[in-house]
């Protein structure tokens, strides 16, 4: 759970605003092609000098808007469950559950996939680009409008053949987190009830 400049002249600002709106339309258009999605993910974190720090595998489920489930598999097991009200983060090794109000996590990468247009517009500047050397891929670079409270410098969401393919995040220490999605199912039968989390008996519960 780790995941803009103001133009100087009126004409430039107008152009930037129009481009941003068009690019948000394009991103929302991609996201609106699915209401539910599930699959697997491979996450790799590299340092500023390119050294691999950590590699993990995960499984995820999304019900738009507002519902998100992410389980990182052992040996770094962690479960994140989000609904429109709360986000629960369960660390089995620590026997601890942290519960946050969803509003506090609105600038996370998860909010992009499970959120709505209004949330994206308030949080990000969106720039669309075609993925290099691959005409079937489309990428969207998102940078935070409120850089003072941002967890990442920027993140890039890529779709391939209209399918969610990857998210790449650059944090404030120049570490790069690359998430590659696989076995993506956009016809998953999901309901809000599947995104309710009950802390296991005996674990510490922290309300943030």
UniProtKB/Swiss-Prot annotation:
Disulfide bonds: none annotated. One of its GO terms (cellular component) is outer membrane-bounded periplasmic space. Residues 1-21 form the signal peptide. The keyword Protein transport applies. GO terms for biological process: lipoprotein localization to outer membrane; lipoprotein transport. Its main location: periplasm. It comes from the Bacteria. The keyword Transmembrane does not apply. It is found in: Periplasm. Belongs to the LolA family. Participates in the translocation of lipoproteins from the inner membrane to the outer membrane. Only forms a complex with a lipoprotein if the residue after the N-terminal Cys is not an aspartate (The Asp acts as a targeting signal to indicate that the lipoprotein should stay in the inner membrane). NCBIfam families: lolA. Monomer. This is Outer-membrane lipoprotein carrier protein. It comes from Saccharophagus degradans (strain 2-40 / ATCC 43961 / DSM 17024). The gene is lolA.
């Amino acid at each position: 759970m780790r995941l803009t400049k103001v133009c100087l002249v009126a004409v430039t600002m107008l152009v930037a605003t129009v481009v941003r709106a068009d690019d948000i339309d394009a991103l929302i258009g991609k996201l609106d092609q699915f209401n539910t999605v599930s699959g697997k993910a491979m996450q790799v974190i590299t340092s500023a000098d390119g050294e691999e720090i950590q590699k993990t595998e995960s499984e995820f489920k999304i019900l738009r808007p507002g519902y998100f489930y992410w389980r990182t598999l052992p040996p770094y097991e962690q479960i994140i469950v989000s609904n429109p009200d709360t986000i629960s983060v369960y660390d089995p090794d620590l026997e601890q559950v942290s519960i946050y109000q969803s509003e506090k996590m609105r600038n996370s990468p998860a909010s992009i996939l499970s959120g709505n247009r209004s949330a994206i517009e308030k949080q990000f500047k969106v720039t669309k680009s075609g993925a290099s050397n691959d005409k079937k891929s489309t990428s969207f670079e998102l940078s935070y409008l409120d850089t003072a409270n941002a967890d990442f410098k920027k993140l890039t969401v890529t779709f391939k053949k209209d399918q969610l393919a990857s998210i790449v995040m650059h944090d404030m220490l120049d570490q790069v987190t690359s998430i590659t999605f696989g076995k993506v199912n956009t016809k998953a039968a999901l309901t809000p009830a599947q995104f309710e989390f009950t802390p296991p008996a005996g674990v510490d519960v922290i309300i943030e």
